[in-house]
Design a protein with these regions (language model features):
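Catalytic helix-loop patch of NAD(P)-dependent Rossmann-fold dehydrogenases
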Residues: 77-92, 114-159, 170-171
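C-terminal "lid/loop" region of Rossmann-like NAD(P)-dependent oxidoreductases
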Residues: 193, 221-224, 232-239, 246-264, ...
C-alpha cells in the first residue's frame, strides 16, 4: 500500500509519516518545506499547489491530508488565507484524485471546531454544527466537499474531526503556552475561567486511529470523531502540567474568553471504537511525555 501524506512536515503529518514508515508502508511525503530533500518527499508551492502532477506520476492507494492552517485567531485576521488552505486546497486535491487516481482513498483532517458550542455532551457526529470562527466554518465546508466528491464522482472520502491534539513536537496551544510562561513569567495567566473543558488526544493515538480508519472505515463521505471520550477542565490539566513540571509559580485565569473558543467539549467516540480504537496514552502519561520532550530541547 502506498500512502501520500500531504503536510508531512507538520505536527500530525510528521508523526503519521514516521508511524507508517515504521510499519514498512510505502510512504510519500508532500509539503511546502524547502530545506529538505529526499526520494520520498515532494516539495509543493505554498501559494499555488499543483497536485495534478503528483497524482499523474504516482500510484497512490491512500491520500492523507494533514495540511492547512490550524489557528482560530489567524482565521479571524485573514479569513481568505484560511479558506484557501483549509477548503480550496481540499477541492484541488480531490480534483486531482478524480482526474488521475479515482480509486485512491482520501482522508482529510477536519476539526472539532465545526461543532462550536454543542447543544449536548457527549458530541455525536450527527450533532448540529455551530462553528464559532472562520476556521471552523472552512473545516465544515471542506467536509461538504468530501461528501460532494463521494456522491457525484464515487471517490472514497472520510473526514476526521480531531479534538484537542497534543504531543511531542507541538510548539503551540495550551501545554507549549504553559511551558513558555513558566520560563518567562513570575505569574502564569491563562485565558478563561479554567472551567472550560476539552477532550484531549495524544498524537500517537491519533495516528493509530488514522490507521484503523484506513483499514475499517466505510469511506462514504462520513465524519468520524477522533478523541478519547474524556472531558478534562483546562484548570485540571494545567495543574497536572504544573505538578509534573515541578514549578512553584502560580496559575491564574483571567476570566476573558478568546474569540472563537468553545466552552465545553467531550466526544462520543462510538464510531471510532467500532473501528477497533482503544486509547493507549492517558492524559497523565501524555503530559509527562511532553514534558520529557520539552526538557530535552
Amino acid at each position: 500500500m502506498k500512502i501520500l501524506i500531504i503536510g508531512s512536515k507538520g505536527f500530525i503529518g510528521q508523526h503519521a509519516f514516521d508511524y507508517f514508515k515504521s510499519l514498512k508502508f510505502e510512504v510519500l511525503g508532500c509539503d511546502v518545506v524547502t530545506d529538505y530533500v529526499s526520494d520520498d518527499y515532494i516539495q509543493i508551492d505554498a501559494t499555488n499547489s499543483d497536485y495534478h502532477t503528483i497524482f499523474e506520476k504516482h500510484n497512490i492507494d491512500v491520500c492523507l491530508n494533514c495540511s492547512g492552517a490550524a489557528s482560530v485567531p489567524l482565521s479571524l485576521e485573514n479569513p481568505f488565507k484560511d479558506f484557501s488552505l483549509n477548503t480550496l486546497n481540499v477541492f484541488k486535491i480531490l480534483e486531482a484524485i478524480r482526474s488521475y487516481q479515482p480509486s485512491c482513498k482520501f482522508i482529510n483532517l477536519s476539526s472539532a471546531a465545526v461543532y462550536g458550542n454543542p447543544e449536548t455532551l457527549p458530541i455525536k457526529e450527527n450533532a448540529t454544527l455551530h462553528p464559532l470562527s472562520p476556521y471552523g466554518i472552512h473545516k465544515m465546508q471542506a467536509e461538504q466537499i468530501l461528501k460532494e466528491f463521494h456522491a457525484y464522482y464515487n471517490i472514497a472520502t472520510c473526514s476526521l474531526r480531531i479534538f484537542s491534539a497534543y504531543g511531542n513536537g507541538l510548539k503551540k496551544q495550551l501545554f507549549w503556552d504553559l511551558y513558555q510562561k513558566f520560563l518567562n513569567n513570575d505569574q502564569i495567566e491563562l485565558f478563561g475561567t479554567g472551567n472550560e473543558s476539552r477532550d484531549f488526544i495524544h498524537v500517537d493515538d491519533i495516528v493509530q486511529a488514522i490507521h484503523l480508519v484506513i483499514q475499517n472505515a466505510k469511506f462514504n463521505g462520513e465524519e468520524i470523531n477522533i478523541a478519547n471520550g474524556e472531558e478534562f477542565t483546562i484548570h485540571d490539566v494545567a495543574e497536572l502540567f504544573h505538578k509534573n513540571f515541578h514549578n512553584s509559580k502560580t496559575i491564574r485565569f483571567n476570566n476573558q474568553v478568546k474569540p472563537g473558543d468553545p466552552l465545553n467539549w467531550r466526544a462520543d467516540i462510538s464510531v471510532l471504537k467500532a473501528l477497533g480504537y482503544q486509547q493507549k496514552i492517558s492524559i497523565e502519561k501524555g503530559i509527562q511525555r511532553y514534558i520529557d520532550w520539552i526538557n530535552a530541547l
